[in-house]
């Protein structure tokens, strides 16, 4: 027995467990200011072996590689399609200083849902880590929403909703990061609608559970 399918399941379970731990940590630390160290710990927790697949990566720190950080669609017969190129690694610390300051000072100054949407987009635009940016970005959303609602309880699963709508998510993210006029209104509208869908889905699940107990 080679156990290949079982190995794959173990890896999948380990990835899911690591992601859930980070999301849980974001919720339960929502009463504290966001810090670079917090995000370093989140990202390191996602890659406990220091590898992403077969590749060794920098963990617990922002990226430092000289190569451009690009979001691409690989193609076998043609050049890769570059959807977005993030700031150079040497500029990441500066961009993240601004981001962290904004995140910690914008609470109560902006609508909570809008703030969560902007936080996710801004973070993904910087793409500060070698890997794990999407999951860290979702953890920031969980933290922002918990701060706005003043609760550490997960009332809905936004990560699951984004995963279900991932095609639309990547399309909206690409559109938002490529707008020359920096108009992020369509992104915010889409993101808020995604939160509403997640809330509706959670409500339906609770209603179904209550009916099954009657």
Give a label for each model feature:
Residues 1-214:
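FIC/Doc superfamily catalytic core
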């Amino acid at each position: 027995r080679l156990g290949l399918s079982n190995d794959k399941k173990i890896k999948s379970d380990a990835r899911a467990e690591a992601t859930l731990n980070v999301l849980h940590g974001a919720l339960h630390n929502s009463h504290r200011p966001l810090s670079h160290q917090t995000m370093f710990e989140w990202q390191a927790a996602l890659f406990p072996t220091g590898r992403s697949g077969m590749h060794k990566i920098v963990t617990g720190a922002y990226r430092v590689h000289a190569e451009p950080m690009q979001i691409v669609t690989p193609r076998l017969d043609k050049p890769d399609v570059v959807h977005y190129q993030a700031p150079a690694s040497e500029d990441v610390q500066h961009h993240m200083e601004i981001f962290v300051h904004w995140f910690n000072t914008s609470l109560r100054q902006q609508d909570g849902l809008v703030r969560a949407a902007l936080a996710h987009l801004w973070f993904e635009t910087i793409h500060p880590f070698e890997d794990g940016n999407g999951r860290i970005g979702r953890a920031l959303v969980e933290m922002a929403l918990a701060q706005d609602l003043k609760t550490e309880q997960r009332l809905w699963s936004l990560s699951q909703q984004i995963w279900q709508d991932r095609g639309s998510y990547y399309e909206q993210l690409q559109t938002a990061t490529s707008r020359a006029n920096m108009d992020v209104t369509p992104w915010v509208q889409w993101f808020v609608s995604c939160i509403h869908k997640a809330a509706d889905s959670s409500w339906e699940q609770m209603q179904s559970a209550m009916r099954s107990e009657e």
